[in-house]
Amino acid sequence: MDETGKDATRLPVGTDRYVLGTAVQTKIAGKPVEGPVYEFAPVINTFLREHLFGDIFGRDVLDFQDRELATAAALASLPAETQLRSHLKGCLNVGLSSQHLKEFVTVLETKVGKSEAQMAARLLDDILQQ
């Protein structure tokens, strides 16, 4: 049986979740996030910033590196290529090395599947060549 981890520390009273979420989202993306989907439905980005990046990423249960790596693994297993590309870039933006991500691809092959690992390797190679 897995050990239960610690509870998340609550955000300080008065924390502006939108401001916090915007800062977290920008750090992971490496730049401010914008684009047609957010212009078409701006509330989507508000929900992402306040809830996902503010409420969840802003807590201290997982650091950004672990959270991005877990997200990349989930996306590779779906497979969700466009989102995986974005989160592999996010892994680099939060400090994971290219070597760490190459090892991640090796783990994907043994734990998830060969085709998923090949997709991740192709995306990673493309990202690293940019």
Residue spans for each PLM region:
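Acidic, glycine/proline-rich low-complexity segments that act as flexible tails and inter-domain linkers
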Residues: 1-64, 93, 106-130
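Short, structured motif recognition centered on aromatic/hydrophobic residues
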Residues: 66-76, 104-108
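Short loop/beta submotifs within extracellular cysteine-rich repeat domains
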Residues: 78-84, 113-114
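Short conserved catalytic/interaction loops centered on acidic-Pro-aromatic/His motifs
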Residues: 81-89, 102
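Accessory, usually C-terminal, subdomains that scaffold auxiliary metal cofactors
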Residues: 94-99
